[in-house]
Amino acid sequence: RGNRKNHILPLVQNLTTLNQEIAMDPYTLGVFLGDGAVISTRIIMETLDWNNIQNLIPYRLVKETITGKNMHLSTRRYQGLREHLNLLLDYTYHISPSGRRTKKFIKRIPNSIYMASFQDRLNCLKGLMDTDGTVDKRRGRCEVGFSDIDLATDTIKLLSTLGIKSSLRPKQIKGAKTHYRMQFNTHLSVFNLDRKRELQHRSPKPEYVNRRYLSKIDEVGVGFCKKLTVQNDEAGYLVGHSLTVAKQTIT
């Protein structure tokens, strides 16, 4: 009827995994991916926010520096954080003007997170949301954004493993990198920070969070292709970062 979307695809509900162990605390990993410095591994947050979640970081605080116009920013360095990141993240090298070579971590969600337990995946997401996430005050909708498309698509996949449907919207910032913003609603609490958690609306309508609507079908032409065989009772499989449910239709 008009522009109404009336074709629905099933949505993955909490991906069942092997509960793989993670080489570091998943919440701290999420916090680093959000507000961590890729060379020094220091993490910068507002001081009041640190006071709210500091007990959730299981590593020993080595140094803290208070900065900012109103002394509102806290930069913290934790013992052992670099060594744990070495086990999970890829890296390149930064060459200083003096020729000194320093390891520079690449911010990506490691594959082991997707195979971790539900709680570990949720804790990693909470770290990302406490640092880079926001809440629409009027609607209570969650948002999170990055200037790196790889980290953005990684986050979409992480959300999908938790049964959360999200949308990705790129926005070109004048004189800066393109910003990729994801929006989603969920019944899950995705924040540890009190000021954000209190704003989240956790009773969205089921039709918004439990359904994926098919909005467009494009003809791709005729050509040779390989037959895909799926060995499970339902002949189903998951496609892309959003883990869209697809089924084998040709036997």
Residue locations for each model-derived region?
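Intein-associated homing endonuclease modules of the LAGLIDADG/DOD-type, together
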Residues: 1-175, 207-251
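Helix N-cap motif at beta-to-alpha junctions
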Residues: 148-150, 186-189
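Long beta-strand-rich cores associated with HINT superfamily self-processing modules
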Residues: 5, 171, 187-209
